[in-house]
Design a protein with these regions (language model features):
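Histidine-acidic metal/acid-base catalytic patches
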Residues: 7-166
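Conserved strand-turn element in the central/C-terminal portion of the radical SAM core barrel
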Residues: 1-6
């Protein structure tokens, strides 16, 4: 969670992991939360995306995700596929956390299958197969949404797209 102390920015997360210095402790990457790292939530000085970033410019987003994942991928042991609309929960200066969206949310900012590749592949585009767990994260919805077969079909479709791409 990017709202937790020591995890509130990607740079702080790396500093925390380096300070702990344990080979069996790593980072759990969640596509929704880590998108917010690029936006500088909870730590504006560590923002990667430009302040005036326009969401239709995928090249700028991809460059920011490359920078982020290059820094955190070596520490990552678990990977959570997710969608985010670029908004957060929380009102304080360090308690903002990711707002997961449904897989097919039209306001979602991520190209799930493509952007998962920044985590699943190294800088040369080679699969790392380094993660112990890969799952969907983003089921914080009402019962009415969770009880719809479409919700689960969309999640499964997104996960299959990630598998097929990587």
């Amino acid at each position: 969670e990017i709202c937790w102390g020591g995890m509130h920015s990607w740079r702080n997360m790396i500093q925390t992991l380096e300070a702990v210095d344990r080979p069996n402790i790593g980072f759990q990457a969640d596509m929704s939360h880590t998108l917010l790292y690029t936006m500088g939530y909870n730590c504006p000085e560590d923002r990667i995306l430009p302040v005036d970033y326009k969401w239709d410019d995928r090249e700028v987003l991809k460059a920011s995700l490359k920078e982020l994942t290059a820094a955190l991928r070596p520490w990552t042991i678990d990977f959570h596929v997710a969608q985010n609309d670029g908004t957060v929960h929380g009102t304080g200066s360090h308690d903002k956390t990711g707002r997961h969206c449904q897989a097919t949310d039209p306001n979602g900012k991520l190209n799930i299958a493509e952007d998962a590749g920044f985590w699943l592949r190294d800088a040369d585009g080679q699969l790392t197969k380094a993660f112990k767990h890969i799952c969907w994260d983003g089921c914080m919805f009402s019962n009415a949404v969770m009880e719809q077969q479409k919700t689960w079909n969309d999640i499964l479709a997104a996960m299959i797209q990630v598998r097929n791409a990587h």
